[in-house]
Amino acid sequence: MFARLANPAHFKPLTGSHITRAAKRLYHPKVIDHYTNPRNVGSMDKSLANVGTGIVGAPACGDVIKLQIQVNDKSGIIENVKFKTFGCGSAIASSSYMTELVRGMSLDEAVKIKNTEIAKELSLPPVKLHCSMLAEDAIKAAIKDYKTKRNPSVLH
């Protein structure tokens, strides 16, 4: 019996359709949408004074998020947002959703976003709440970076 189990000829590889069906059973449709069609993926020039960059990670699972905001210096409104995430579907979905959420917000509004808002919108299970926490930490880090660039003598 064990010899049969050890024989690779008896295993069928998972195809894209198998993976998609499994994901649909485990994830809410909003997570699948943001994972398969992520919004605002990319990078901005972090050396620009009106661009704030936040890079955060979770050592326990290996997820890393880089989130960047471009702020209108006169109005304080976030005009552009980009992200790159190395991580699971929930981390990518949380990042993508965050970019949609903060575009058009003031810095004061964006810094108040809590991970629970993201988790609720995406219907994340408790085991994936850390992904929404990373998105919250990333926007806060990006805002801090932007403010530090604008006034380096003040700690935020």
From Swiss-Prot:
Primary location: mitochondrion
Subcellular localization, as worded in the UniProt entry: Mitochondrion matrix
Biochemical pathway: Cofactor biosynthesis; iron-sulfur cluster biosynthesis
Cofactor: record remark: Binds 1 [2Fe-2S] cluster per subunit.
Disruption phenotype: Cells deleted for both ISU1 and ISU2 have decreased activity of several respiratory enzymes that contain Fe-S clusters. As a result, cells grow poorly on carbon sources requiring respiration and also accumulate abnormally high levels of iron in their mitochondria. Knockdown of ISU1 in ISU2 knockout cells reduces cell growth, decreases cytosolic tRNA thiolation, and increases association between SSQ1 and GRX5.
Keyword line: 2Fe-2S, Iron, Iron-sulfur, Metal-binding, Mitochondrion, Transit peptide
Gene Ontology CC: one annotated term: mitochondrial matrix
One of the record's GO molecular function terms: ferrous iron binding
Keyword Transit peptide: yes
One GO term of the biological process aspect: tRNA wobble uridine modification
InterPro entries, sorted: ISCU (IPR011339), NIF_FeS_clus_asmbl_NifU_N (IPR002871)
Organelle transit peptide: 1-26
Domain of life (superkingdom): Eukaryota
Cofactor list: [2Fe-2S] cluster
Assigned protein family: Belongs to the NifU family.
Miscellaneous notes: Present with 3420 molecules/cell in log phase SD medium.
Stated role: Scaffold protein for the de novo synthesis of iron-sulfur (Fe-S) clusters within mitochondria, which is required for maturation of both mitochondrial and cytoplasmic [2Fe-2S] and [4Fe-4S] proteins. First, a [2Fe-2S] cluster is transiently assembled on the scaffold proteins ISU1 and ISU2. In a second step, the cluster is released from ISU1/ISU2, transferred to glutaredoxin GRX5, followed by the formation of mitochondrial [2Fe-2S] proteins, the synthesis of [4Fe-4S] clusters and their target-specific insertion into the recipient apoproteins.
Oligomeric and partner information: Component of the core Fe-S cluster (ISC) assembly machinery. Interacts with frataxin. Interacts with the mitochondrial co-chaperones JAC1 and SSQ1. Interacts with NFS1. Interacts with ferredoxin YAH1; interacts with the reduced form.
Protein name, per record: Iron sulfur cluster assembly protein 2, mitochondrial
Species: Saccharomyces cerevisiae (strain ATCC 204508 / S288c)
Gene: ISU2
